[in-house]
């Protein structure tokens, strides 16, 4: 999503847009075309990218290629399945809360979420989810990730988020020994599987053997529950704004029949959130960015699991009948109650993937690397997060780990 090509389908996983053809080509896709890439087609996502699995009703679930009883993840699940199954060596993807890194972890791929402002945006949208959503790709090799980042990066003056470009030298020169903090505790207090912990400790040992200074920490840099509550408020308001534009374009009001139930609930909740609350949570994101900048004065890198569990079974996050009934009547509740229901709607899937969203709020670069497979052959990645603008550190570490056969 956010990667439209003029004249080509762009449904965003929604029944509203099954016959829609993009009217213009996004700057991201223009850059790919300039670099000589051949665009094969579109891949599947959940409706409007709201989930960490890909199961849009108009397309059906996306299977994990090495276990078709499981989901490939989301929201860039179709892209991940394409690369993992060998159809393409890389696939464009977007990440608004882990949508590159989560399927990368499940599919044994490399998934980089670049710093906010690194990759071309517009002209249809310059501030996706207030900067939380960014574009990049899923790959199989660090070399491809480095080359793609170097050639795709931009200093885009019309964008609200602007970065100086990374030099070729900075992406190729040897890295000094880094200070790396690692933790395996969920930022929202949920369960983290033994496999996810084992993956993280394997990566920590490997990085230490490469000469880096690795320290286990117990305290989360940010308040994870508060951060996710702010994320859902943003998601709700941005969805309400999106449907306001859709209603204007179609000349009618939206109904539940136009969308999936989860989308309906998010849409309804966004219509009641006061503007002052939205302003406060965006200011809160700035404070999170400040807190992480202070954290990186002590540590160059934060290492965590990418996800808490291996890829989920199809239907694992099905909503209870009671919750579905509440969501159908979402408009009847005040906004605090609506947000409680949004939390309840997402909590099972959030427990599965609680580590990725914070980098979207702060704008930091973060990468998932494929370091572990469990006894069933299911992949789990680890996540490395650096200070804003320091993709070079992430990619140097990734390259070192790849060259030392840490990847699995």
Per-region residue spans from a language model:
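A short helix-breaking turn/cap at a secondary-structure junction
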Residues: 113-203, 406-408
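Short, well-ordered beta-strand elements
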Residues: 137, 378-387, 394-395
